[in-house]
Amino acid sequence: MSKKGIMIVGHGSRYRYNQRTMETQAERLRTMGFDNVYIGYNETAHPFIVETLVEMAKDGIDEIVAVPFFVASGRHMTEQIIFKLRLKEGENHKIIDVDGHSIMMHFETPFGEDPLLAKILHEKFCETRDTSKRSGALIIGHGSRLPFNKDIITLNAKRLKDEMGHKDVYYAFNEFDEPTIEETIDKMVNDGVEEIVAIPLFISEGDHLKNDVPPKIHLQDGIREGTFTQNGREITVKYCLPIGSDYRLTQLLAEKIRKYGY
């Protein structure tokens, strides 16, 4: 019988937010009864993916389920992470060699297409909005030079509108893709929205959510609610936390892992 191990693959950040989120998810998996749960980061934070691979090989792991804790695929996934896992483009299941130790590698997909994400966005919007105002949901994506992130953001915005019944649903991107956050804020105001509930479809806080996004939605760093005046009207803005610590995402990870006989 093979000795199985789990690697939760994270982006990594110079802030501790991403690491805390990853560590929380890993500990929840252990509490659920999963053994040999490891974390590997693509950049900045340790242990790096390659360091975790070596550690798992030393521990005698000969089958790895690598689960990316990402909303969507993108350049990091297609140009960096896959090769750090000793795979080639298009490969998801392969026997790899780590310091002379043969390991069966299974590389799973991000979770952004799962219908659960729209439910999480729906709950965040309903918990945050003021029902006495015309409130609009602004789903904020990172943006990418590849199409994956935009596809996931638009998919979940569409589900929030069509399946959850919310009329005023908008989306925007911090960089690379369009529409920009500023453009979408203007459109929401022009459409008559009185309150903007900004929901970042991100894993964790970090440089973008702390430094880039707040001024684009007329807030200062660390402030979750405020107002601004445009077209002679006062608009309320509420800024939600990212989704990565939601306990239901642990269930999604578990579902992906159980496919491999855990």
Language-model features, listed with the residues they occupy:
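Active-site-proximal alpha-helix that buttresses catalytic centers in soluble enzyme cores
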Residues: 1-262
